[in-house]
Amino acid sequence: WVWEQYDHIIGGNTFQRPGGDAAVVRVLDGPKGLALTTDVTPRYCEADPFEGGKQAVAEAWRNLTAVGAKPLALTDNLNFGNPEKPEIMGQFVGCVRGIAAACQALDFPVVSGNVSLYNETQGRAILPTPTIGGVGLLDDFSISVTLAFKAEGEAILLIGGAPGWLGQSLYLRDVCGREEGAPPPVDLAAERRHGDFVRGLIAAGQATAVHDLSDGGLLVALAEMAMASGIGAELEALSGHLPHAFWFGEDQGRYLVTVAAAQAVAVLEKAAKGAIPAQRLGRTAGNALILPPERPILIATLVRRFEGWLPSYMSGGAA
């Protein structure tokens, strides 16, 4: 709803509009494209500034990768409270160190930025918010992919592991009413391996849809892919996992990828050879999310709930 209030197709060069992992714009009249994204998770930064700083950079890197772009550089917008308070300065230092560690590990340099301090209301500071704006390059913008499912009958693959980290997750906060625990750790070496693998699938034309996993975890990402397309998903029954942790854990360095059913085995074998954790979750099908043994959730219901609440809230209706 927010980005729809503004002109986001100036000059007619917008190839992928906002609303996905990254927007893509064409560079002049040639084949190249630029992908752009902004990311930060303030609750992670408050719980562990160093890991939160790493995660902000890593998520921007993932979002660019998810559309097929090679991440080039970033700008940081560091928003904090009063640095004269030791705890706020500690947040600032920790986040900056985390950002630096991620930039070095991912070859993703900071080329500009700004700092906004003393952000308080009645002496209460904002959450530490080191926003990362990332840009990536596509040699051919036409090969970029989106998060929307493309056709029924395709295999849905999870790239990256599934430990089920619930600390500081939306599930823990919004369902359990608890804001506690450490945020998910960011393994920068794994982040790079997994992202390079996914980018290779896109370049080879094997990936038909890609979405990185972040807020809300696996099931939220699946719902977003389904809502973007109107195509549902039949998911396989879990074995050996706690359902709430598997579906809502916010572990880092992960992607959902769809491929043609005939290519699924080859992609999984390729992942295994590269020591990339990967598994099949199910297939695209129908008009609902089917998660045994739970009742199906119609995509139309998800779209109505997801797209309707903010316009209603902004117009004075019920939240």
Pin down the residues of each PLM region.
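Glycine-rich phosphate/pyrophosphate-binding loop regions near the starts of catalytic domains
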Residues: 1-164, 170-177
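Glycine-/charge-enriched secondary-structure boundary and capping motifs
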Residues: 31, 95-102, 106, 111, ...
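Long hydrophobic segments that form regular secondary structure
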Residues: 1-23, 27-35, 41, 53, ...
